[in-house]
Amino acid sequence: MALPKGRLGDRMYDLLARIGYGCTEDYNATRKLVVENPAAGIRYFLVKPSDVAIYVEHGAADVGIVGKDILTEASADVYELLDTGLGRCRMCVAAPADYKDDPSRPVRVATKFVNIAKSYYASIGRDIDIIKLNGSIELAPILGLSDVIVDIVETGTTLRENGLRVVTEFMPCLLYTSPSPRDMRRSR
């Protein structure tokens, strides 16, 4: 099973451990990227969240836990099997409090979710210029690099603390388990 490194992967592992699928070594104390419990027949691969779907799609992992945002952005050939009920967030367009859209020019959008942003703005017929960033997305409109951002939002605290507001929410982002189509065909 491919688990995303970080808070959501840790929460999912804790849940799995509580139902008997923990590891023989201390998951939280190791820096190993593969941890297992041979007696339970489970092995966890700890990978970057954006790589979970790739490991599953190519058969290196039978199943993975990944956020809807990552799954959508990656466009991987995997099935969305189950909403785990964890990691409830939403994909949003956010902007400075005083932002006013000017339809006479393309919107400058900063995001790490390029495919999701393009798809959303295409669906509303709006021209955009994408600025690909890998972190601290909220900084872009503050420094005038972009008009708006497209990012995942859980509570909105980071937006508010940086003088930004949600303009629109357009996609829920939940944590999913995702088997590859190849695995689904094998299990039939």
Where are these regions (language model features)?
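Single conserved hydrophobic/aromatic residue that forms the stacking wall/gate
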Residues: 176-188
